[in-house]
């Protein structure tokens, strides 16, 4: 899967714009892919990555990037898995800096508002700088993520802070239907 290693995390390995794959012939077992449409379709329906051809294009392309799991799963495609994995690595590295550091608290043992906002902004900035700015997240006004920390968490009693990070993935046009007809005025 050399293509996966050479493209950004949000990119689908089957993107037609990236061009065809290098092999000039591909096989499923001993049969050419071109002659095994039913077998290829059956394998694809089970959630496996398979090659395909397009009318009007030369060469082979990956049909999509499924993960061989329930198609409704959030991580049913390699694109989403790679995006969330990268966000996880950035969040881990960013929040690790805060581990065992002193935290200014309110009288009830909760984090002070300014500390919460600082942590939220630090993580959002890291994700936006390393992912959103590179086009790896779908964004509005440069923001491709949202971080939330509940200020009511009692750090003194639990020594634990739960941080919620949500990233906005891209969508993919897996199907395009064109409604074609004549444009004529009724006489």
Label for each model-derived stretch:
Residues 75-77, 113, 170:
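Histidine (H) residue identity feature
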Residues 1-103, 138:
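A glycine- and small-residue-enriched flexible loop/hinge signal that marks low-structured segments
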Residues 55, 140, 156-158:
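A generic structural signal for short, non-catalytic loop/turn and secondary-structure boundary residues
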Residues 80-149:
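Acidic, low-complexity glycine/serine/threonine-rich segments
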Residues 12, 34, 38, 80, ...:
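Detector for Asparagine
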Residues 31-32, 42-45, 143-148, 159-161:
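Short amphipathic alpha-helical surface micro-motifs
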Residues 150-187:
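C-terminal edge-of-domain segments
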